[in-house]
Amino acid sequence: MTPKESGKPISCAMKKLKGKRSKILVLSRDAGTNELKPTKGRAHRACIACRKRKVRCSGNIPCRLCQTNSYECKYDRPPRNSSVFDREVSDDSSLYAQRASHEREDSKGPISSIDYKKVVETIFPPETLRQILASSSFNSQNFLDTIKTCLLQGQLNVNQVIRQSLPKDTPWHMQTSVPLPPREIALKFIQKTWDCACVLFRFYHRPTIISILDSIYEAEKHGKQYTPEQVKTQPLIYSVLAVGALFSKEDLSKDSKATREFYTDEGYRYFLEAKNSLDFSNITDIYSIQAIFMMTIFLQCSANLKACYSFIGIALRAALKEGLHRRSSIVGPTPIQDETKKRLFWSVYKLDLYMNCILGFPSGIDESDIDQEFPLDVDDENISTIGIKFQDWRTISSCGMNNKHTKLILIMSRIYKLMYSLRRKPLEEDSRTQIVSLNDQLDNWYAQLPDILKVDTIRYRQTQPPLTVSANDTSSPYTKPKKLLYLDFLLSKIVLYKPFYHYISIDPLDIPEFQFQIHMAENCIEVAKKVIQLSYEMITQNLLSGSYWFSIHTIFFSVACLKFYVYQTEKGLIRNGKVDSDIHNATQLGSEILSLLKGASNASKRTFEVLNQLFKEFNEKTSVLSEQLLNIVKLQRQESSGALVPQLQTNNNFTKCQGELHHGQQHHQTPATSLRSILNLPQGEADLKFQNTNNESHTTTAAQEEYLDKLLAEFEEFDYSINRVLPDVIDFSALIGQDSSANNQIFSSEFSSDPTVN
């Protein structure tokens, strides 16, 4: 009798991704269906009960032993060791790919219960289809290719139509176009999402998600129909897997090109499946809002900011529609649901604030319209359906760390409203008081952090060891969160100091009235150096991911500040006339860090290219305009008395100036918003002279005044763009290679000085 006839296991060799040994896939014939099925291998983990009794565990939930004896089946958390994780993902990826391939082949089989005619009529109404077919320019091949492209890109969703055409007793798993990965791979993806993308965004209850995921795999295993709760959580599961796949490929070596591409494709397919499973016009449950939030993270880490802003807007408005911004929404029925609502709202709201600060858009809801409480500082394990066990006072939970981050983003939002408002006022005494108050709020926020969340003093060191990546720093679970917190703290400081950065080239001895502005500009330089030092420490400890937009944006922004300073110095516009060695070294180190992060993944490369393109778009125009204006100012100062007015005008308004110029003011008129007022030139000099190419002096003409005013009008338009459209990026992207002394004079009209403020 042959092995096939006897039903004994049949072995077939499968090639491993790593190593020379073959991995054996054992198949056995099912007695009921007479089909070959994989034999259950050794479980990756054993439950607590099996390990205590030292028996073999089946790896299920509940496992065979616990189910038989009615024990409580619990598992420890998956291992967090990065090297183990990398090795397991690489070892299992071939099995994962083969399983996915088999399931995709199975999905191609005919399902006789689907009414394909109804599907076609729903997608293409008969009258419209007849008009298309009757057209003289109709090409059947192009028509089919277009449909195929739309299906692959997720623009054409036929899943809903197919689901409606299936009988009610059809198992739901047959309706999913993208199968779930093996459970072990799914758990690794979820853990990767939590450890990389959601360190400072706790919007979920981990045990609940894991429990639902296990129930889905159990339903798949036994061919059961999904429950309503499982159906609702399906988009959330796929969106979490998408982000996990996006970050997982960074752990693989660059030589594993096929595996990295596999993770890229899988992440995108999971994202499309999550998007196609949602009805964005009718978001009414918490799971759907969580799914949209995770899709927002996926888009942001893929550098798709336009779609990211749209998705976070949908999530915020869905949360508002459900009343999550009000304390009255906390009505149970369980403490888990109440805490999840609070966590979800504050995560969505602070991400919306962050995106507004980056893209220069107004906030969707004001802070004064919110009375929702912050989530409790307790770990997920201490929250159950019957009550909450409060946290040990000596520790802080991950949710407590997220509360600290939320308070920081709220301060950043207040800074943005004051410093980047369309109706910003001149820098008078009350404005300076507000700026100092915001700076104190940031300092107080950091001072009130628990000691365990405070980083060691960050000082830039001129001599740095070679930039190499080591294993993850697992000495403390607080290491990565506290450094990410401090990175966003430094970003908030830069957002506060950035509007004064143009004053970096002014010598306070020449213009003592600008001491406040110059001090703020110098602070911006120091904070940028701290960002570079902190990112260097994080990347050497393997705590920094190239796909994590929040960190790479902050680093890129800091490098832009330092490069602008270096350029200004090389042009001879900085008072000391040479570049400080620590600034020059920090600039080079920052560039090396960005280059290393750029090569981490395709998402990292795209993020780098998006930010780098913002430099190039504004560099040429600002450089030409600033050099022209700077030369004119120098000529005027040479011909004037050389002394600046003691009291600078404080009521200048660029919009008013531009409007008056367009109404045809003559050059002999000198209103308060005239060119000389903006440039801080003596008002009594009505006959300022210019030197032409033949060294012949002549008085200012209307054409020259018009030309100068045109330059100022263009600067006003540019100033509006860089401070509103993308305030955190375009501003310094434009300033790489720019002469800014003229721009400093322009800003002086907006921010008047007061020597009494230190």
From Swiss-Prot:
UniProt keyword list: DNA-binding, Metal-binding, Nucleus, Transcription, Transcription regulation, Zinc
InterPro entries associated with the record: Stress_Response_Reg, Transcription_factor_dom_fun, Zn2-C6_fun-type_DNA-bd_sf, Zn2Cys6_DnaBD
Compartments in which it is found: Nucleus
Gene3D superfamilies for this protein: Zn(2)-C6 fungal-type DNA-binding domain (4.10.240.10)
Matches recorded under SMART domains: Fungal_trans, GAL4
Record-annotated DNA-binding residue ranges: 47-73
Upregulation: Weakly cell cycle regulated, peaking in S phase.
Pfam family membership, one: Zn_clus
GO annotation (BP), single: DNA-templated transcription
GO molecular function: DNA binding; DNA-binding transcription factor activity, RNA polymerase II-specific; zinc ion binding
One Gene Ontology cellular component annotation held by this UniProt entry: nucleus
SUPFAM superfamilies registered for this protein in UniProt: Zn2/Cys6 DNA-binding domain
Domain of life: Eukaryota
Family: Belongs to the ASG1 family.
Name this protein carries in UniProt: Putative transcriptional regulatory protein YJL206C
Organism: Saccharomyces cerevisiae (strain ATCC 204508 / S288c)
